[in-house]
Amino acid sequence: MLKGSLGLVALGAMLLSSAAVAQEKIKVGVTATLEGTYTVLGEDGIRGYQTALNTLGKKVGDKELEFVIASTDATPDSAIRAVRKLIEQDKVQILLSPLSGDEGIAVKNFAKTHPELTFINAASGAQETTFVDPAPNFFRYNMDGAQWQVGLGKYAYDTKGYRKIATIGEDYSFVYTQVFGLVLEFCGAGGQVTNRQWVPLGTKDFASVIAALPDDVDAIYLGLGGADAVNFLNQYQQAGGKAHLMGGSIMVDQTILSAKGNAKNALLGTLAASGQADTWEDPGWQKFVKAYQDAFPANKRFPSPSLLATNYYNSTMALILGLRQVNGDLSNNQAKLKEALAKIELDAPNGKIKLDSNRQAIGTNFVTEVVDDGKGALFSKVVKVIPNVNQTLGYDPAVFAKIGLPSRTVPECKKY
């Protein structure tokens, strides 16, 4: 009888020990666009997250981080399905999500239905996500699409001498935000945007778009990414297009500059702006690039991290540093973690990042030009660095609010 009792005690101790071990895990859900037009962006986002784990590790005090990855296709519905599955089925406690603009607005709104959890934006860049009715438990450590265009319009006008441009953009919130930033600055300097065309995500035939481009412009701005960007460049070259090109942030990062085929060569000399630049000589950036390169075989990565890899890296870093500050304490609806995340200042690879009162990143922006490294590889070369870019782009908040939210027609081409 005593022997049996001892066995039960031992079994009970084992079960309690197992439960304790299970409680030592902090579960984090991660989403990325691993299907659809932006698949290549999502894949590199995951590389950035993995690079952060390689650099920082997964230990938080005596707890271990456990990650669950879910796929989306850049649509709001797919993002909400993925996040709901991660919460309800996988029982994650923290979300690192999402990647794309419309997804971000949807996940921000969804976050309000789960105030007990913490949501850290992975990479999405629509302005509305944090600027309009922000969620108290949603934190974004990357700038939005308009912030990523700061410096481009002025440089195009003052240095390149461009006076008239046309734009082509994917018809959704992130690219509206990118064009918003470009138009505000270019038109504010005295330039004209004479033609704005919008195409659905996943467009394969750009013939009518190319045919409708005006001839009397100094440059064409491309707010495209992923497969859309490659398809346009191929067809533009075949049509004999010769105009100067300007690019949005995901038009000229390594997701496109490393694409197979000759289409990317049309981008040589393209002026653009982004939250990073491949050739930046800052030691922190160079260290990150090496960590990314060392983490994956050369044929399983880009020559340099894309903007998505950098965003996922920074978001993962913020999460781990925040958790370590509070020793993994998720009590009281994760109140200590949320307070820490709001105050963290990241010494990120692409410059210092801090959050404003809406938990939106204030960071560094880069005006770049696409160059050949002499061996056939294309990179973005720094031509100007702009620090401390906030979400109102330096405008008085009251003036900025009156401009309106980014859309197909907002802002107007005028000086505000």
Question: Which residues fall in each region the model found?
Answer:
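Sec/Tat signal peptide C-region and signal peptidase I cleavage site
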Residues: L16-A22
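Beta-alpha junction/loop-to-helix N-cap segments that form part of ligand/metal-binding clefts
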Residues: K25, V40-G45, T55, K59-V132, ...
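Solvent-exposed, acidic/polar segments of extracytosolic/periplasmic ligand-binding ectodomains
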Residues: I26, A342-Y416
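Extracytoplasmic "Venus flytrap"
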Residues: G29-Q50, A70-D77, L99-D102, I168-Y176, ...
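Venus flytrap/periplasmic-binding-protein-like
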Residues: T72, I120-E128, L201-G202, K242-K264, ...
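Extracellular/periplasmic Venus flytrap/periplasmic-binding protein
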Residues: S78-R81, Q127-T130, P136-G240, T279-K287, ...
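Extracellular/periplasmic periplasmic-binding protein-like sensory domains
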Residues: Y236-N314, L323-L330, S380-K381, I386-K415
